[in-house]
Regions:
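Beta-strand/loop nucleic-acid-binding surfaces
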Residues: 270-283
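N-terminal ordered "arm"
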Residues: 3-71
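Short, charged beta-turn/beta-strand-edge "cap" motif at the junction between a beta-strand
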Residues: 294-304
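Structural detector for short beta-strands of small beta-barrel domains
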Residues: 236-257
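Short nucleic-acid-contacting surface segments enriched for D/E, G, S/T with interspersed K/R
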Residues: 280-293
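Long, hydrophobic alpha/beta structural blocks
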Residues: 40-233
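OB-fold (S1/OB) nucleic-acid-binding surfaces
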Residues: 254-273
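Conserved small/polar residues in nucleotide/adenosyl-binding loops
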Residues: 1-5, 309-317
Length: 318
């Protein structure tokens, strides 16, 4: 899993990885960083790597014994966004999940890797959730086709390489930018409901933007024309190429390797996310106001309940 280098495991070999996972499981169980679902005999162990990063180790319980199946690195999100509807589906090769999310502000359909797996498994049975009496996690059933509406999502991303760009010269007054964004949101919502006028206005707006870019690209550098971008990258559906303004910046130290990790909140096309990147993999000096450009693995935590990030708290589903 090469993406682990984003949170400070640049030179992690197989032997050290196995030892770290084993020690992390024992230590986390002792400290109570364990989530268990007794209906499915599944569980997760949280290994903290720095203040806001860690490893999410998923497995199954056989009695009191925890049997490791897979893990993934994660970072805690610092922002959240609203969405109209999400659907969640299991990956074929293991008991991990992808989320398809219609982000309400931008109208963009996002696909990301679900962080809080155990919260979702609990939500399947919950009376305020999907209300499923029976659920076979090993079989692809109808539960994955049930839309989940109006849940906040905290987007995060891991990057194994990127560069820092200077800000673009174009400056828009905050009040004017907010007004334009609000108007665009209204058009997007109306278009989703079938409003032909809204669809036509959005189409004309896109054509005008395309024509303007086609003329300017002949004389200007592409990164001086636009402030940010967010687009799919590669063959994996949760990989994106992003350019975004850095709104917040912190440095954290990996407790195991002592490598430095940059934690950035960036804004891409009015979409905020928290990004982790290893200092050794970043070209340039990051600073608030500058821009980050790189390929990211998009993750997200869905607030199935009012309290977010319950996947970091020890609890048990009876």
């Amino acid at each position: 899993m090469y993406k682990r280098q984003a949170i400070g495991f640049q030179y992690l070999d197989a032997d050290f990885e196995e030892e770290m996972i084993h020690a992390g499981i024992l230590d986390s169980i002792e400290k109570g960083f364990v989530i268990k679902n007794t209906k499915l005999n599944r569980g997760a162990v949280i290994v903290r790597v720095s203040e806001s990063t860690g490893l999410y180790i998923y497995g199954r319980f056989k009695g009191d014994e925890f049997i490791y199946e897979y893990y993934f690195p994660f970072i805690l999100g610092k922002t959240s966004c609203d969405n109209d509807e999400i659907t969640i589906e299991r990956h074929l090769d293991k008991e991990s999940f992808a989320v398809v999310c219609d982000e309400s502000r931008t109208g963009v359909t996002l696909i990301f890797y679900l962080q809080n797996v155990m919260d979702y498994l609990e939500f399947i049975f919950d009376k305020d959730g999907l209300k499923q009496k029976e659920y076979n996690i090993d079989r692809k059933g109808s539960v994955y086709r049930i839309p989940i509406k109006n849940k906040k999502v905290s987007l995060t991303a891991l990057s194994i390489g990127g560069m820092i760009l200077l800000p673009s010269h174009r400056k828009v007054e905050p009040v004017k930018a907010k007004k334009e964004q609000d108007e665009r949101e209204k058009l997007i919502q109306a278009a989703k409901k079938g409003d032909e006028t809204a669809i036509e206005n959005l189409t004309i707006e896109d054509i005008d933007t395309y024509n303007e870019l086609s003329q300017r690209i002949l004389k200007e550098d592409v990164f001086s024309i636009f402030d940010s971008s967010f687009m799919p990258c590669g063959v994996e559906c949760d990989q994106y190429q992003v350019v975004g303004e850095i709104l917040e910046l912190e440095e954290e130290i990996n407790h195991y390797t002592k490598e430095t990790v940059y934690i950035m909140v960036i804004e891409c096309n009015n979409l905020s996310m928290t990004v982790a990147v290893n200092k050794a993999d970043l070209l340039g000096e990051p600073a608030v106001g500058r821009r980050f450009k790189g390929q990211v693995w998009l993750q997200g935590s869905v607030a199935f309940k009012a309290v977010s990030y319950t996947h970091l708290r020890a609890h048990e589903t009876k």
